[in-house]
Amino acid sequence: MKLKLSNITSSCKHLLLACTLLSIAPNTYAAVTWNTINPHVQFLKQQDKLRFYDSNQVLIEGEKCALLVDTSANFAAVEQLAEDLKKRLKTPLCYLVATHYHDDHLLGMAVMQNFYPDAKLVVHQQVNKNFSLYQTAYTDKLDTYEKSIELSYQRLANVPKEEQPKWRDKLKLAKKRLFRWQEYQLSKPEIVINSRKIIDLGGFEVTLEPQQAHTNGDLTITTNNGSVLIGGDIVDWLPYPGHGELKSWQTLLKQYINDEKLTIIIPGHGGTLTKEQLKQPLSFLTAITEHVKNNKDQSIEQLMLSFPESVIEPYKQEALNIKSSNFFLQAGLNRAKSAE
């Protein structure tokens, strides 16, 4: 009996989705690049094609302790990073800092906590307040993976016979990883930040500050006497405003732009920035709030069409930026409109 091409294509796509979700594709983790900012700070930059879907990490190490900022949403990548740290670190990993609650920054901490149970999770007080929601989000994500694997097994018969052994092996590995991740749990924070806090890693200090900008529970980290800022998604060149505190976010960006000490800015997504480059996200966020304020009677669709072209133009240099900027703009307009 001949299979319809559409059925085969659909089955292959679903199998690919299941395996992608469980990070089976080869070289997924290898594309993350390690960049030395200074002898104490390593910037783990996510590959460009995933820059709007997965996060960067930052490793900071003093003479007595190390601190990791954020984790990937790719649990297999987090496991690989945990293994790599065993080879790289000269000191214990004492702290795990989540810059905010979004999945691609927080949920992978469950994996890291399993490998480094003595490391203390550090979060904003607002994240701590709602932490049970994020623990549920971790289990929900695994439930989604499990359903995808089950459906993929059901559709395996529709895949060409010569392709089946390959996909069966991939799904077997996916199931093995899933069972392992189901044994992990996102453990409660041990350090909750509600005001400026300095952590001494041993001859090297980091300063953590609570913010309300990209979300209502952000953390920023500065090092090297304020010259290096690890700003999470607050300082992304193309920022996602859908959960943002837009006015205070703009104020904070202005503060960074005018900070004479600041020389290196590490975002949650994309490459390092200069203070001059921060003017673009500031312009984007400011235009969103002003556009909504000045056109209160317009629908979101109308606001999208009438949004200043000069502000959005820098984001139209490549397809991924265009797609993401349109989605982010819509989310920002909705956020600003709800705040009016």
Annotate each predicted stretch with a short phrase:
Residues E205-D259:
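Active-site-proximal loop/helix segments of hydrolase catalytic cores
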Residues K87-I191, I198, A287-E290:
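Active-site HxH/HxHxD metal-binding segment of metal-dependent hydrolases
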Residues W34-K86, L219-D233:
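Conserved beta-strand hairpin/beta-sheet module of binuclear metal-dependent hydrolase folds
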Residues V69-S72, C94-H102, V122-Q125, P210-Q211, ...:
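Active-site neighborhood of phospho(di)ester-bond hydrolases with catalytic His/Asp-centered motifs
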Residues K247-E301:
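Divalent-metal (often Zn2+) His-rich catalytic cores of metallo-beta-lactamase-fold enzymes
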Residues K2-L16:
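Bacterial N-terminal signal peptides that target proteins for export
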Residues N294-E340:
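C-terminal regulatory/interaction regions
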